[in-house]
Amino acid sequence: MTASASRPLLGCIADDFTGATDLANMLVKSGMRTVQTIGVPAESASIDADAIVVALKSRTIPAADAVAQSLAAYEWLRAQGCRQFFFKYCSTFDSTDAGNIGPVADALLDAAGGGFTIACPAFPENGRTIYRGHLFVGDVLLNESGMENHPLTPMKDANLVRVLQRQTSSKVGLIRYDTIARGAADVRACIAQLRADGVRIAIADALSDRDLYVLGEACAALPLVTGGSGIALGLPENFRRAAELAARDNAASLPRIDGTATVLAGSASKATNAQVAAWRATRPSFRIDPLAAARGEPVVDQALAFARSHLPEPVLIYATATPDEVKAVQQALGVEAAGELVERTLAAIAHGLRALGVRKFVVAGGETSGAVVQALGVKSLQIGAQIDPGVPATATIDTEPLGLALKSGNFGAVDFFDKALRALDGAA
């Protein structure tokens, strides 16, 4: 295959929508023209891109369903001609003892072959590092970072070898930081020894971007790689080294999109709470009350009326709340029902906003982003320049043009909403 061929080289499967854009952002920064599809396309298509990211909504669904969706995505990507496959999950390893990281990794490894893969959610640029198999968020262990209070995937153990081993019958091992520090050749030797010992999946330490580049080089021959978006840093260079990927300076170009903008927030993370507070201090905002929505009050109509009264000025419509407030709603409605209600409400609001002429959406929260893009009928996205680490601007390429910034809950600076609006306006 030559560098000018249009068939994609890297096929990626992400377990949520913002995670998919996070990964696509990383690939674009590394010079790969990247297209993100929303779900598995219904039919084969000729996509002119170096990498394709299939965005699923499989992180918290039953494990068997997550496996089925992931395998369907794999088969579709394989049919497009992808040479290597990547299973992307959150940099905080969001999962439970039932999955879904372990079951999906096992199924994809069986399908792709090779008998071995790594698991590395590290993203040092965003403070996620792995040392001796333990995941840190900033300076604290994962289970002390606030993730222990996550409503759907509470992370109460920072030892990823233990966490993953509880999810899989495959033997889980570790590639230590000191091996990685010695370079790709030593990592490949470690992989060979782990395979000889019966290990199928190895957690990989990573303290810096250099470690991720080393791991990427060491994984060049693996049919399947798994991890957070950070590990994708080193994968494009493998294709360049093999003269399969051309050098590009326009991988992040997007069309300009006119129209008004709105911010929608559903995440209850610390970062999103801070971003909501910063916006509310100076800008118009409307709070969604899940309990009012559950009582049948016209919350969607009220939110749309609020937005209409302020257009063309951007407004924030949010369900973001403190952990105690979230817990109270969950106790009243049930954990799953509460989350689904918030997603359904914000999705309906997004649909209504589009009818009002809104063409640019900033969305905070992985589950919320998934619900919103589905409500807007988005099928695929072209990935543009980074707004904040892990979050790019995007534009739809298969519907009436829309600009989207889809943010994982914990990502972004305090002023992210303003920065995202400027980026979607073409000013950033």
Curated annotation (Swiss-Prot):
Catalyzes the ATP-dependent phosphorylation of 3-oxo-tetronate to 3-oxo-tetronate 4-phosphate. Belongs to the four-carbon acid sugar kinase family. GO terms for molecular function: ATP binding; kinase activity. It comes from Burkholderia multivorans (strain ATCC 17616 / 249). It is an enzyme of class 2 (transferase). Its EC number is 2.7.1.217. Keywords: ATP-binding, Carbohydrate metabolism, Kinase, Nucleotide-binding, Transferase. InterPro entries: 4-carb_acid_sugar_kinase_N, 4-carb_acid_sugar_kinase_N_sf, NBD_C, NBD_C_sf, OtnK. The keyword Zinc does not apply. This is 3-oxo-tetronate kinase. The keyword Kinase applies. ATP binds at residues 267, 365-368, 409. NCBIfam families: OxoTetrKin (NF043035). Coiled coil: none annotated. It catalyses: 3-dehydro-L-erythronate + ATP = 3-dehydro-4-O-phospho-L-erythronate + ADP + H(+); 3-dehydro-D-erythronate + ATP = 3-dehydro-4-O-phospho-D-erythronate + ADP + H(+).
